[in-house]
Amino acid sequence: HRTILNVRRNRTERELNAVLVRLLEKEGTHGLAPGIQAPRATFNAIFLIRHAAVHFQKEGIVLRHLCDWACFLTRHWDEIDHALFRTAMEDYRMDRFADLMTAAAVEYLGAEVPGPECEAGMLGRFMEEVLTLSPMPDKPLPRLLRKLSGPYRNRWRLREVLRTPVWRYYYDTVRGQWNEKFTVFR
């Protein structure tokens, strides 16, 4: 990858990519094993939430995404720069999503970290979707239809959680597909 995020998609991706690059330059990496370097915890926290948020707005997320977050929090909570993480989440309208992911990790998966305040109804709706999401179809046409209709059918994800207008999602999708030679068909 030339960039960390898909910077052709929209301004948010470009700006958040710049935040992640600055974070890498500031904090550096740490060695996992001889010859293997990995970004530090704050970088990974921002990246994991952004990755899950992109899936959440398109087709939804599954338990695996939530388990990844719960395991990450359990292991790296003390290493995260929480002020920087919170600022990034608020600046890019992912704070509600991060709170839902963290609250679900604490309440449903037993992550032993401080749980944020979340509206119970929204957390219940979030978990219902996570636990009942059907697999993505294998055939190209049903796959395309699901990708295109999912955000409209589940507008609450965009409006209430990510605070993004539905039209903006579709605009960014068309623009991103134009720049990426229509990967939506894959």
Model segments located where?
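Conserved NTP-donor binding/palm subdomain of two-metal-ion nucleotidyltransferases/polymerases, i.e.
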Residues: H1-R186
